[in-house]
A protein has these predicted regions:
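Membrane-water interface segments at the C-terminal ends of transmembrane alpha-helices
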Residues: 1-106, 132-152, 182-199, 224-253, ...
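Short helix-to-coil transition segments within interhelical loops
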Residues: 106-133, 160, 356, 362-383, ...
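Transmembrane alpha-helical segments of polytopic membrane transport and secretion proteins
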Residues: 199-235, 451-466
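Juxtamembrane inter-helical linkers in multi-pass membrane proteins
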Residues: 116-124, 206-221, 255-256, 260-261, ...
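Solenoid-repeat scaffolds in large eukaryotic assemblies
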Residues: 115-116, 179-180, 364, 431-433
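Glycine-rich helix-loop "coupling/hinge" segments at transmembrane-helix boundaries
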Residues: 76, 149-175, 399-430, 466
Length: 466
């Protein structure tokens, strides 16, 4: 290990943060100016971009600019470089400042604009919009810095030496716990700084305000700025979302290798779905039970810790003769994933619980309705969608996860994400596309099953009412 790698990691994270914040804020101007169903579609595109697994994004760019990439002979861009890692991470993380700035800018009111009717164009950006979104930019910048600093998958695949990736390589080859504790405190310090940065600060969520009329906003923003932001949005979505998806779906080798990938990775497919399903379900249930206790807000620390550091801690705790029944089994993977992503379950269930009509809760308590009637007539209509959304986010995070499980995965417990991660270390592999397609289908599986199940339940409830 070298402390010089810490400087390289901080430089990489700083560049990614700077570029992601600039791109995200400029695109948020376009989103504020959109309205109706168009805005919904644009927001879905932003969220979908952030939802892509990191190894899938890396694989797409390797397919274009790798050693044998499609465009390598035309464009002399080296994907295996510091600049390549910076580019990929920016394409992954720009939605964070975009969405947070969008939430802040939606707090713009007509009264604020009427106070200075002469401010337009760049003056509006400088004196109104930037100060209004400054807090969101700071918060999102801290989040992106931590995510970029702790990211191991992208630098490791692109062979860029950074502090967290080198920490993982050295520990996995020596299992030197003394070295792990000597350098691991730095990896734990960064998330602590994040928690301090958010202490006492409010986050402007996009759904908390109706925002300004889009026509008024666009008129004050000016022709040049609104068109530049629209071009930037379109280009960024094409590069960061449509290009990776197109490279996957339009590649003939993806479909030729699809059946073979299913046969070769059937066990990994089962492991991926089972680990993600169990973790999302357990975290959601425990999140409901603990949503009243604010002390669990500290669990956000585990989310922003590097997954390999959490794996090292798990090994040091459970690698005991008396715990052989637990160590090296699937339960160890599920508990590690549950701890890392518990903050999402707790925060999501807490928000859902607080959004329920208090008068209706009092009425159900007064009449002593059963738990099924409470769910059917109170919870499901008001927060059923929110509960499923929280569950689904955790499911996706577990499905994509490689860093948490890479050190603790049991024999025969390899997931699809981990298999892709390992294959990409040897360059762009034709079978990787097929495995990524299977992962995307696994991501869509709960949505399909949920839709079918909702139809069955609605039909059953109608018959029950009759």
């Amino acid at each position: 290990m070298s402390w010089g790698l810490l400087i390289d990691s901080c430089l990489l994270a700083f560049l990614v943060t700077l570029l992601a914040v600039v791109v995200g804020w400029c695109i948020s101007l376009f989103l504020v100016g959109a309205s109706g169903w168009k805005r919904v579609i644009f927001l879905v595109g932003v969220v979908a971009t952030f939802s892509l697994p990191p190894f899938f994004v890396v694989n797409s760019w390797l397919g274009l600019f790798g050693k044998v990439g499609l465009l390598k002979s035309w464009v002399s861009i080296d994907a295996y470089s510091f600049g390549g890692a910076t580019w990929v991470l920016v394409m992954m993380f720009w939605p964070v400042p975009c969405l947070m700035s969008f939430g802040a800018l939606k707090r713009l009111t007509p009264e604020l604009l009427d106070a200075e009717p002469g401010i337009r164009g760049f003056g509006l950006l400088k004196y109104v919009l930037f100060p209004l979104s400054y807090s969101a930019l700071f918060q999102s910048g801290v989040i992106v810095f931590v995510l970029a600093f702790n990211n191991i998958a992208v630098p490791a695949i692109l062979q860029v030496k950074v502090f967290p990736a080198q920490f993982w390589v050295q520990f996995s080859s020596t299992y030197n716990f003394q070295m792990a504790w000597q350098y691991g405190w730095v990896l734990a310090l960064i998330p602590m700084v994040l928690l301090l940065a958010f202490n006492g600060r409010m986050i402007a969520w996009p759904w908390e305000s109706q925002g300004l009329d889009s026509n008024v906003f666009l008129e004050r923003l000016g022709y040049i700025i609104r068109n530049l932001s629209a071009v930037l949005f379109g280009g960024t979505i094409v590069i960061s979302l449509l290009l990776p998806l197109g490279q996957l779906l339009l590649n003939a080798r993806t479909w030729l290798d699809f059946s073979g990938a299913i046969q070769a990775g059937s066990r990994s497919i089962f492991n991926s779905f089972w680990f993600a399903f169990l973790t999302a379900s357990s975290v959601s249930v425990i999140g409901v039970l603990t949503s009243s206790y604010k002390v669990f807000r500290l669990t956000w620390l585990f989310l922003f810790l590097p997954g390999v550091l959490l794996g090292v801690v798990w090994i040091s705790i459970f690698n005991r003769p008396s715990l052989d029944w637990f160590y090296g089994g699937g339960c160890m993977v599920v508990t590690a994933l549950s701890l890392r992503y518990f903050a999402f379950g707790w925060e999501g269930m807490r928000g859902a619980k607080n959004s329920i009509d208090a008068d209706l809760v009092s009425a159900t308590d007064l009449f002593g309705v059963s738990w099924w009637q409470r769910w059917r007539h109170l919870l499901q209509p008001q927060v059923g969608w929110a509960i499923f959304a929280v569950w689904y986010v955790i499911y996706l995070l577990c499905l994509w996860d490689t860093e948490t499980v890479v050190l603790i995965v049991p024999p025969g417990g390899e997931t699809l994400a981990l298999r892709v991660f390992n294959l990409l270390h040897y360059g762009h592999h034709s079978q990787v596309n097929a495995l990524c397609l299977i992962l995307l289908l696994l991501a869509l599986l709960p949505l399909v099953l949920g839709f079918v199940l909702s139809l069955i339940i609605k039909k059953w409830l109608k018959q029950d009412d009759l």
